[in-house]
Amino acid sequence: MPVLGSQRRLLGSLNCTPPATFPLMLAPNRTGPQCLEVSIPNGLFLSLGLVSLVENVLVVAAIAKNSNLHSPMYYFICCLAVSDLLVSVSNVLETAVMLLLEAGALAARAAVVQQLDNVIDVLICGSMVSSLCFLGAIAVDRYISIFYALRYHSVVTLPRAWRIIAAIWVASILTSLLFITYYNHTVVLLCLVGFFIAMLALMAVLYVHMLARACQHARGIARLQKRQRPIHRGFGLKGAATLTILLGVFFLCWGPFFLHLSLIVLCPQHPTCGCIFKNFNLFLALIICNAIVDPLIYAFRSQELRKTLQEVLQCSW
């Protein structure tokens, strides 16, 4: 990506240098103290991408196979899996081409590699934006199902869900094209960072409100059963743990990447910010890890989906 760092660009592989021997090293900074740089080998990128690819393909296959899963909620989960799938495909493709170029097994002109790099950048940016959008859509869907349970099926209908899905994909494609075209404009970066903060705030507010309602409901049941403390404490701790994992994974996997974008605007020449810029590959690896974790949080917890997944695996064997 042009603005995000030079480490992962395909053009750099045309004139490659030997990789670092140690994965964790101190990178010299001419204008300040030494920086801690985490080097992510291409093999690790490839492995993470393949794991995420397999996981999300299974989610899409399971939802497509089982007609009981053809509902708005599972369609949003399916689209999240497709977004994560595109993140994985783009990174696997880029890593594979880089490895082939470095090994001399693939001969390509700089112009061809530039075009391929642009296509991959559009894929990565579009899939990132759509992934964030579908995470927000899933949160809104769950919120409506809890607070407007009686009206849920009249509010969240299949036609509306399809329109939302189409709008998200169109917006993601347009956003990625604008980002690649105007990557050197500060406003574009600030809009992306603002979008991430908005999604984080939306998810935090909705899930915290859902947890509060669930705890209130549990207290009501406990009072009826005259066992208020044991049920309330256990349920509250379990709900808080689930919420912490959900929001924590989201923030830890996406936060460093958008911190990187923020610092490009705020302090592009500062030595400390320069140290953070050197770890861009680590931030990309965390996003791929998020694509691995998403199916575990949003898809595989469904008993119906797990059952269908077993059938899919049995058919494949």
From Swiss-Prot:
It holds the Pfam family 7tm_1. It is a multi-pass membrane protein. Glycans are attached at N29. Residues 1-37, 94-118, 184-191, 267-279 are extracellular. GO terms for cellular component: plasma membrane. Its main location: membrane. It is found in: Cell membrane. The keyword ATP-binding does not apply. Residues 64-72, 141-163, 212-240, 301-317 are cytoplasmic. PROSITE patterns: G_PROTEIN_RECEP_F1_1 (PS00237), G_PROTEIN_RECEP_F1_2 (PS50262). GO terms for molecular function: melanocyte-stimulating hormone receptor activity. A lipid is attached at C315 (S-palmitoyl cysteine). The chain crosses the membrane at residues 38-63, 73-93, 119-140, 164-183, 192-211, 241-266, 280-300. Keywords: Cell membrane, G-protein coupled receptor, Glycoprotein, Lipoprotein, Membrane, Palmitate, Receptor, Transducer, Transmembrane, Transmembrane helix. Belongs to the G-protein coupled receptor 1 family. PANTHER family: G-PROTEIN COUPLED RECEPTOR. Receptor for MSH (alpha, beta and gamma) and ACTH. The activity of this receptor is mediated by G proteins which activate adenylate cyclase. Mediates melanogenesis, the production of eumelanin (black/brown) and phaeomelanin (red/yellow), via regulation of cAMP signaling in melanocytes. Interacts with MGRN1, but does not undergo MGRN1-mediated ubiquitination; this interaction competes with GNAS-binding and thus inhibits agonist-induced cAMP production. Interacts with OPN3; the interaction results in a decrease in MC1R-mediated cAMP signaling and ultimately a decrease in melanin production in melanocytes. This is Melanocyte-stimulating hormone receptor. The lineage of its organism: Eukaryota, Metazoa, Chordata, Craniata, Vertebrata.
